[in-house]
Curated annotation (Swiss-Prot):
FMN binds at S9, S15, V16, S17, M96, Y97, N98, F99, S140, R141, G142, G143. The lineage of its organism: Bacteria, Pseudomonadati, Pseudomonadota, Gammaproteobacteria, Lysobacterales. It catalyses: 2 a quinone + NADH + H(+) = 2 a 1,4-benzosemiquinone + NAD(+); N,N-dimethyl-1,4-phenylenediamine + anthranilate + 2 NAD(+) = 2-(4-dimethylaminophenyl)diazenylbenzoate + 2 NADH + 2 H(+). Binds 1 FMN per subunit. Its EC number is 1.6.5.-, 1.7.1.17. This is FMN-dependent NADH:quinone oxidoreductase 2.
Amino acid sequence: MRLLHLDSSILTDTSVSRQLTAQVVQDLHAAIDDLHATYRDLAAVPIAHLSGAIAAGFRPLPQPASDAALVAEHALSEQLVDEFLASDIVVIGAPMYNFSVPTQLKAWIDRIAQPGRTFRYTANGPEGLAGGKQLIVASSRGGMYTQGPMASLDFQEAYLTATFGFLGVRDVHFVRAENQSRGPEPAAAALISAQASIADVVRSVGRGVAHARVEA
């Protein structure tokens, strides 16, 4: 059983999303015996943003790239998509930045959203090829976006749900800490609530993993 753990917050010790992913991963290891984890810190070791030359490597090239740096980028793209496809559980720390996801996380998504690998187009429309995974997103936001006047500005969780759904990942679980910029008391209460929700999320993921094993 393979786990892919990604953090994307530009903060370190004070990062709420990092606190949440750490607890999620710890609880997953406690609940699932044979769990082997791969970790990437997308902020500390950022992935280059997609360029035309990098994206060209998603398809067979007429002739191999000769530039060493570009060859390395093509190899990294393959490594990233292989890690994603091999994973049974994906845990992503995704704070909201300017109503969306960190640019570091977007760079990773742009590498793994590869035609023919994680999705394809058919006569009946697009088809995701990365199904069967359990995705847990540790979401931290400065305000309240699940309801109220700011809900229409949520291009973070909505984007992640749509993008991974397009890739075939339907089991998406959010561990959510809102109101992190609304003062110490609301922030602390929201974090405690998010931490308390992790146990239920881990149980749900465990059931999903067990069901997938039976089907396999």
